[in-house]
Amino acid sequence: YDKSSKGIDYLKKNFSVEICSNISDAVKESDLVVIASPLSSYKEILLSIRTSLKENVILTDTGSAKKEVNKIISNLNLKNVNWIASHPIAGTEYSGPEAGFASLFKNRWCIISVDKKKVAEDKIKSLENFWSKLGSKTKRMTFEDHDYVLSLTSHLPHAVAYSIVRSAINKEDKFKDDVIQYSAGG
């Protein structure tokens, strides 16, 4: 399933895939459902599929924030669903099926976050196996730890660039303008 007609056209042209026009139909018999869309669309997607999810399904995602998504999942009170958050640290600046390539996950980390009181260990291992077969190395973290660690790593390059620019502004240096112009891509 893909909302984008451009994405669907690309998939049909380049791969032998079955495409559903209805998201509820797409998940009906699935043992594993992966939400790979912008975080802002999660609630809408979950509301659309919640009555169609197979009992005991593994539900995961590929998003970069976990604590808020976990709240959405909890508030929807999904029954007989194994919610295990995933965050593959892979990809490029591009999105959609066109941005995929065979080695996308090879030797890349995938962080798994789960409430072990709500999900059986065999379900967690099954999802870890899924990511491993795609080439990923998996690491478990709590929802909170994930968000803390990733907020530091994703914001760190911006903080460094800001520090460089700030230092240049405070100096009387012949390269001051060049440092400011070329920091963080200009």
Residue ranges and their predicted role:
Residues Y1, D61-T62, S86, S113, ...:
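Generic beta-sheet signal
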Residues Y1-F15:
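NAD(P)-binding Rossmann-fold cofactor-contacting core
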Residues K3-S4, S37-P38, T62:
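Short beta->alpha hinge that forms the Motif I/post-I loop of the SAM-binding pocket
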Residues V17, S30, N56, N107-R108, ...:
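Short, well-ordered alpha-helix to beta-strand connector turns
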Residues E18-I23, K139-M141:
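Short acidic-hydrophobic, aromatic-tinged amphipathic segments that line or gate anion-handling sites
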Residues I23-L53, V57-I58:
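Rossmann-like NAD(P)-binding element
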Residues I45-E98:
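Rossmann-like NAD(P)(H) cofactor-binding subdomain of soluble oxidoreductases
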Residues L104-G186:
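Internal alpha-helical scaffold of NAD(P)-dependent oxidoreductase catalytic cores
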